Amino acid sequence: GYTHAFESTFESKSGLQEYLDSAALAAFAEGFLPTLSQRSFNWGTDLGMESAELNR
């Protein structure tokens, strides 16, 4: 089973996009993601949400 979770919330869709475009995130992901045996991401769905839905 899962032992850890990483969750982020953003004030707006543009805030989420800024995070996803970040060079720092890309560098972190390059080193971190290969160490995971199980991953679950829902970014595609989140990117399609209206900003009011992102603020729930």
Curated annotation (Swiss-Prot):
Q: For this UniProt entry, which residues form the secretion signal?
A: none
Which parts of the sequence belong to the Stress-response A/B barrel domain?
1-44
What SUPFAM superfamilies does the annotation carry?
A: Dimeric alpha+beta barrel
Q: Which Pfam families match?
A: Dabb
Query: Can you say what this protein is called?
Result: Stable protein 1
Q: Which organism is it from?
A: Populus euphratica
- Mind giving the lineage of the organism this protein is from? Eukaryota, Viridiplantae, Streptophyta, Embryophyta, Tracheophyta
